[in-house]
């Protein structure tokens, strides 16, 4: 990479399929897909409505037919990311075919695999889309902040359920499952930022192995 030159992710067709979102002919969906790719690759502020329209092959007037503002389009993008995250990461990681604590370990494995694949396709680890936009927009746009807050709270639920099961099974000492799940997800977001900064997806897996030791120091062995 040349010093001082801005690196831009290029979300290819393959990356789009990894996200579970094939390109569609529907105009509204094309706008969502284009905004998703551009904002995830760069940032909310760095992407304008005209660029989104150009990528989608849509006239600007059509944009405002579907979305009153870039904020409204971004909320739709967040909803689409959440649907993918629920199904492809959380849903698979927390399937009950493993003991509850192993599901948490598997979450970090799946998250690392996704980030590694994105890096292979784009050259950069993009990080967590929710954490990315939270860092950028939480002090600037309350509607976006609230949506990301809701998404993150929703993501804590399978962690809480797994922890509660582990307590019931005697694999963990008595803990506040909800509070511990919140701490775990905060750790997830910190790991994602650190791994993104290092551009090393494998750090997500490596640091994930420490997660339960940090939030439950007296974890039974």
Question: What are the residue ranges of the model-derived segments?
Answer:
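Hydrophobic alpha-helical connector segments
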Residues: 76, 90-126, 181-184
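Amphipathic C-terminal alpha-helical segment
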Residues: 114-118, 135, 140, 165, ...
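Hydrophobic alpha-helical bundle segments that form small-molecule/ligand-binding pockets
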Residues: 3, 140-144, 152-180, 216-221
């Amino acid at each position: 990479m040349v010093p001082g030159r801005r690196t831009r992710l290029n979300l290819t067709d393959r990356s789009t399929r990894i996200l579970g979102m094939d390109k569609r002919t529907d105009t509204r969906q094309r706008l969502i897909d284009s905004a998703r790719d551009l904002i995830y690759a760069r940032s909310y502020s760095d992407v304008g409505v005209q660029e989104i329209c150009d990528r989608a092959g849509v006239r600007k007037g059509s944009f405002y037919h579907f979305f009153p503002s870039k904020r409204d389009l971004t909320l739709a993008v967040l909803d689409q990311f959440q649907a993918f995250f629920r199904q492809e990461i959380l849903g698979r990681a927390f399937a009950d075919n493993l003991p509850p604590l192993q599901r948490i370990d598997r979450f970090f494995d799946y998250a690392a695999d996704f980030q590694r694949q994105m890096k292979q396709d784009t050259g950069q680890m993009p990080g967590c889309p929710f954490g990315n936009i939270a860092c950028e927009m939480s002090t600037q746009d309350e509607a976006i902040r609230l949506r990301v807050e809701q998404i993150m709270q929703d993501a804590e639920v399978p962690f809480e359920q797994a922890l509660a099961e582990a307590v019931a099974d005697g694999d963990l000492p008595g803990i506040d499952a909800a509070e511990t799940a919140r701490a775990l997800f905060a750790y997830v977001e910190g790991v994602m930022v650190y791994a993104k900064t290092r551009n090393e997806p494998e750090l997500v897996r490596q640091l994930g192995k420490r997660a339960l030791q940090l939030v439950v120091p007296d974890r039974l062995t």
